[in-house]
Amino acid sequence: MAEFEKSISFDGRDIRLKVGLLAPQAGGSVLIESGDTAVLVTATRSAGREGIDFLPLTVDYEERLYAAGRIPGGIMRREGRPPEKTILTSRLIDRPLRPLFPSWLRDDLQIVALTMSMDEQVPPDVLAVTGASIATLIAKIPFNGPMAAVRVGLVGDDFIINPTYAEIEAGDLDLVVAGSPHGVIMVEAGANQLPERDIIEAIDFGYEAVRDLIKAQLDLVAELGLEIVQEAPPEVDQTLENYIRDRASDEIKKILAQFELTKPERDAALDVVKDNIATAIAELPEEDPIRLAATANSKALGNTFKDITKYFMRRQIVEDNVRVDGRKLDQVRPVSSQVGVLPKRVHGSGLFNRGLTQVLSACTLGTPGDAQNLNDDLQTDQSKRYLHHYNFPPFSVGETKPLRAPGRREIGHGALAERAILPVLPPKEQFPYVIRVVSEVLSSNGSTSMGSVCGSTLALMDAGVPILKPVSGAAMGLIKEGDEVRVLTDIQGIEDFLGDMDFKVAGTDAGITALQMDMKISGLSLEVIAQAIHQAKDARLHILDKMLQTIDTPRTETSPYAPRLLTIKIDPDMIGLVIGPGGKTIKGITEETGAKIDIEDDGTVTISAVDENKAKRARNIVQGMTRKLNEGDVYAGRVTRIIPIGAFVEFLPGKEGMIHISQLADYRVGKVEDEVAVGDEVIVKVREIDNKGRINLTRLGIHPDQAAAAREAAAVNR
């Protein structure tokens, strides 16, 4: 393909599309640039696999450190395991792209996005999302696009398209909206307790920009002489479906109408019906068309039965406005919660139940040194003081599987719940702890990520973290049949699996802190999105009220097993003195007191120990070391060495001065050793600090009260 370039302008910021320059053997490729940020996105298709019942789409986003002019650390000096941010960006690309591929497509598809250059202004993630659509179009893959994404920021009262990092940091909103010509497909946002109307307006504002990017893609395709591929779906043999409908429809509808059934009971009842069908088919002659259709692949019977069940469940909701558990469309499942369910060795814990979904969250308070360093990120010098980790063991859905490292889903759910809590955390100056919350999904029947938000709030309050406001969350669903639309509150597993939308909304009673919307259809109108957001508010506040009946304010004290933190400020020029050569001084203080010391570049010193007395002792030592000395100050010290003309005394940790032989006594001293020996405790006064910083001490002219006070201060420091 010949090289071609096209530009689109947003508020004076250009997005440049370069086609035919790089990756000529990929199915489709584009270099998408804005400012000095450049992302290469490729799309490649290979022949389909036999016997699979899903679209094998793989999306990989990676960042090369050369993009920021950096060399990786470690022995190998090359990029290693992808950091969490790249996994989240891979998901950000996948989520709006996947629903636009035909449901029948079974070819292997791979989208690879490489950030090859990055400036300090333009985030690469939304460029990668739009680039994925362009690469797919160029690769001539069947695709119900184009699709594009933009970021919306809010600085003051003004919405901004594709804000810079600084504008995102300064604003109250970080929202990514992706859409197709058919409507909005995906929304991802973090917000500072913004009201629903602002979020809806931001989505609308962003979708207008998305439409401009879609038009630019259509123009690009036309200018390249390409056509959007719309392959006809393969013919589907209805033999097996008709057979199952004739024999099982009444039983399926009857089971779906038994609202008293629990999820396991409903699943078991449906399995009995499916097994009876399988038995009947197995008794048919081998050449029977029905048996041939059922044995065409190992999943034919199960998938067909699932599709028929999906049809009747959706019809029941649309026609009767009733769900499989008997709830109204806007009704939340029964909610209960507890705090302090684990012993106080765990700094805080919260148990949240909503229907059959159960999440146990545990909070741990750590020291500043426990913050997560993000040096592998293209944005350097970053760290996280709040961490949320989400675990989804197989027993939570009654399955047996090997336990493995967290996958993309677990990382994504954990990040969403983390984002929901961030706006209500106390400032570092008020609460200097590093905070980690782990949410264990103990039982899953839908909306576990929002259950993790609720569990996190309970655990934080139980741990004594003074959060600004409690946060709750709810997941909304959607059933769309033609023009008929039903928005479902607090979806359970089967509604998530068989529905058209998963829309998670978290926030306080003042506004939204996080939301995430994913579609299984090719787009949704703003009116339906607005309905879901407002319906979610009612659900959130209902759940929040139930949580506040368990604990309405954070505990006033932290666990006795949590570290006690003391924070002081020292002159940054004194940092080297506290650390000492090779860390000798700070290690010595730690060994002597049992306290941990963290020092920041601005001179903030955080001292921690489970025993507060140990922390105070270390604080006193550091304060003594960094105290500004004045002539006339009196200290208790110990003789460290003797020379012919005097004795050296350490009177503060790391600070030493000399007593001249003439200042040892108010009479003539013949030999220093006649008055003091190494290890002796002596009371000294600062006599002089010369222009080289050398400290001259004396034992003369010290009042008994001064000596007593110095001994007392020294005893405290010990």
Swiss-Prot record:
Q: Which UniProt keywords apply?
A: Cytoplasm, Magnesium, Metal-binding, Nucleotidyltransferase, RNA-binding, Transferase
Q: Name one GO biological process term.
A: mRNA catabolic process
> Where does the record locate the signal sequence feature?
none
Its Gene Ontology cellular component terms are: cytosol
Give the cofactors, semicolon-separated: Mg(2+)
UniProt superkingdom: Bacteria
Which residue range or ranges hold the KH domain?
563-622
Which residues make up the binding site for Mg(2+)? 496, 502
Q: Which positions fall inside the S1 motif domain?
A: 632-700
Name the Gene Ontology molecular function terms of this record: 3'-5'-RNA exonuclease activity; magnesium ion binding; polyribonucleotide nucleotidyltransferase activity; RNA binding
Where it mainly occurs, coarsely classed, is: cytoplasm
What Gene3D superfamilies does its record include? GHMP Kinase, N-terminal domain, K Homology domain, type 1, Nucleic acid-binding proteins
Tell me the compartments it is located in: Cytoplasm
Question: SMART domains, alphabetically?
Answer: KH, S1
Note the InterPro entries from the entry: ExoRNase_PH_dom1, ExoRNase_PH_dom2, ExoRNase_PH_dom2_sf, KH_dom, KH_dom_type_1, KH_dom_type_1_sf, NA-bd_OB-fold, PNPase
Give the family, as the similarity comment puts it: Belongs to the polyribonucleotide nucleotidyltransferase family.
User: So what does this one do?
Assistant: Involved in mRNA degradation. Catalyzes the phosphorolysis of single-stranded polyribonucleotides processively in the 3'- to 5'-direction.
What name goes with this protein?
Polyribonucleotide nucleotidyltransferase
Q: Which organism is it from?
A: Trichormus variabilis (strain ATCC 29413 / PCC 7937)
